[in-house]
């Protein structure tokens, strides 16, 4: 896969992650006053970064030794990385057991919307470039 295809694919996948994150943040905000509600968050970026670094390292043809010693261990490629929703059980912000901080969630909401807008612009630019090349 060339760098253009990879960047388009990553931008598309990241838009899906941002949509999921938007939904999770909205759920947190909607339950700000629900007793014992635990906030959730979406994790994706750290695993994606690790997978990309692993792919780069394997593309450098590093000497790895005997693969039989890995006992079936397979490093994840960036296409294998999936977003995950994690519940925050450890923190308690209010006496009713709820741990949603509305200010933090609103900040996360705005930040997520800005990143989503940026990546939609990146996708539009990629497709505009392809359209120019085709013409």
UniProtKB/Swiss-Prot annotation:
It comes from Borrelia hermsii. It is found in: Bacterial flagellum basal body. The lineage of its organism: Bacteria, Pseudomonadati, Spirochaetota, Spirochaetia, Spirochaetales. Belongs to the flagella basal body rod proteins family. This is Flagellar basal body rod protein FlgB. It holds the Pfam family Flg_bb_rod. One of its GO terms (biological process) is bacterial-type flagellum-dependent swarming motility. PROSITE patterns: FLAGELLA_BB_ROD (PS00588). Structural component of flagellum, the bacterial motility apparatus. Part of the rod structure of flagellar basal body. The basal body constitutes a major portion of the flagellar organelle and consists of a number of rings mounted on a central rod. In Gram-negative bacteria, at least four rings, L, P, S and M are present, whereas Gram-positive bacteria lack the L and P rings. The rod consists of about 26 subunits of FlgG in the distal portion, and FlgB, FlgC and FlgF build up the proximal portion of the rod with about 6 subunits each. Keywords: Bacterial flagellum. One of its GO terms (cellular component) is bacterial-type flagellum basal body, rod. Coiled coil: none annotated. It comes from the Bacteria.
């Amino acid at each position: 896969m060339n760098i253009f295809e990879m960047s388009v694919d990553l931008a598309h996948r990241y838009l899906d992650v941002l949509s999921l994150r938007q939904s999770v943040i909205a759920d947190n905000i909607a339950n700000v006053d629900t007793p014992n509600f635990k906030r959730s968050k979406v994790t994706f970026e750290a695993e994606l970064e690790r997978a990309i670094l692993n792919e780069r390292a394997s593309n450098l043809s590093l000497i790895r030794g005997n693969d039989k010693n890995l006992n079936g261990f397979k490093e994840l490629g960036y296409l294998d990385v999936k977003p995950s929703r994690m519940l925050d059980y450890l923190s308690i912000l209010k006496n009713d057991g709820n741990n949603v901080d509305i200010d933090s969630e609103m900040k996360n909401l705005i930040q997520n919307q800005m990143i989503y807008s940026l990546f939609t612009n990146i996708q539009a630019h990629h497709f505009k470039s392809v359209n120019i090349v085709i013409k």
